[in-house]
């Protein structure tokens, strides 16, 4: 059962940097619904993409799986036999809860839940890879290498779903969408103190890119096609396609 996020409702003397620890994991479903506009839509539509792209006898990777929402959405929509989902996260608290969530929903497609660094995971025979608000937590210098590895591990006709918080090259647009996002959080019950303290903890950990930067990286990795398929304020999701026909 998810608890309401009140982690930052009182002043914290020494904030430090953001970590996905036990306290965050406990309130994560409430936190992300109230903080990320369009999150539920992205999760459900990842399932729709899985129905289109996942092929028999292949693997799906959910890199930075948190509590397994995307994994469950994918699994509900797989229409083929002999598929496997590999869900990876480096947070022990997230992984523990993810395993419980996955086990609570029975389905034919097996899920392997892995506690580990997504940079160290071998990607092979993949028809679909999901990076759902994960890449932004890697050092910028490490992002291209991960995308390169994903492209190489995808089968022809495979897809990468890349969801992120965006920055904007147009400062005026960036300011508007930043303010709209804060309005969204206020409307969901977060106080100015909560918004400010969480932002302070995230600012050195979550480093955002523009859509243009993401597309440039995807092209460099080898993806022949990529496009923004969902956006709400400064959050959104791209799909990148590897050319070829699935076997």
From Swiss-Prot:
S-adenosyl-L-methionine binds at residues 39, 64-66, 89-90, 117-118, 132, 199. GO terms for molecular function: carboxyl- or carbamoyltransferase activity; S-adenosyl-L-methionine binding. Gene3D superfamilies: Vaccinia Virus protein VP39. Its EC number is 2.1.3.-. Disruption phenotype: Deletion mutant shows accumulation of 5-methoxyuridine (mo5U34) and 5-hydroxyuridine (ho5U34) in tRNA. InterPro entries: CmoA (IPR005271), Methyltransf_25 (IPR041698), SAM-dependent_MTases_sf (IPR029063). Keywords: S-adenosyl-L-methionine, Transferase. It is an enzyme of class 2 (transferase). One of its GO terms (biological process) is tRNA wobble uridine modification. It catalyses: prephenate + S-adenosyl-L-methionine = carboxy-S-adenosyl-L-methionine + 3-phenylpyruvate + H2O. NCBIfam families: carboxy-S-adenosyl-L-methionine synthase CmoA, PRK15451.1. Homodimer. Belongs to the class I-like SAM-binding methyltransferase superfamily. Cx-SAM synthase family. PANTHER family: CARBOXY-S-ADENOSYL-L-METHIONINE SYNTHASE, TRANS-ACONITATE 2-METHYLTRANSFERASE-RELATED. HAMAP family: Cx_SAM_synthase (MF_01589). Catalyzes the conversion of S-adenosyl-L-methionine (SAM) to carboxy-S-adenosyl-L-methionine (Cx-SAM). This is Carboxy-S-adenosyl-L-methionine synthase. It comes from Salmonella typhimurium (strain LT2 / SGSC1412 / ATCC 700720). The gene is cmoA.
């Amino acid at each position: 059962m998810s608890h309401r996020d009140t982690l930052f409702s009182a002043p914290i003397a020494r904030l430090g940097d953001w970590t996905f620890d036990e306290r965050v994991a406990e309130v994560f479903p409430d936190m992300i619904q109230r903080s990320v506009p369009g999150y539920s839509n992205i999760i459900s539509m990842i399932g729709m993409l899985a129905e289109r792209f996942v092929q028999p006898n292949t693997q799906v990777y959910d890199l930075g799986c948190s509590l397994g929402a995307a994994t469950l959405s994918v699994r509900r929509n797989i229409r083929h036999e002999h598929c496997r989902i590999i869900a990876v996260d480096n947070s022990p608290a997230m992984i523990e809860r993810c395993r419980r969530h996955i086990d609570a929903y029975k389905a034919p497609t097996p899920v392997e839940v892995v506690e580990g660094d997504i940079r160290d995971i071998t990607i092979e025979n993949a028809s679909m890879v999901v990076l759902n608000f994960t890449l932004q937590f890697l050092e910028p210098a490490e992002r291209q290498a991960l995308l390169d590895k994903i492209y190489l591990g995808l089968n022809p006709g495979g897809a990468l779903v890349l969801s992120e918080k965006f920055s904007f090259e147009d400062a005026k647009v960036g300011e508007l969408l930043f303010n709209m996002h804060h309005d969204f959080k206020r409307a969901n019950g977060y106080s100015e103190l909560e918004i400010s303290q969480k932002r302070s903890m995230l600012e050195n950990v979550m480093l955002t890119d523009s859509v243009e930067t993401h597309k440039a990286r995807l092209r460099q990795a080898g993806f022949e096609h990529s496009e923004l398929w969902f956006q709400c304020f400064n959050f959104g999701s791209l799909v990148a396609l590897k050319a070829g026909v699935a076997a």
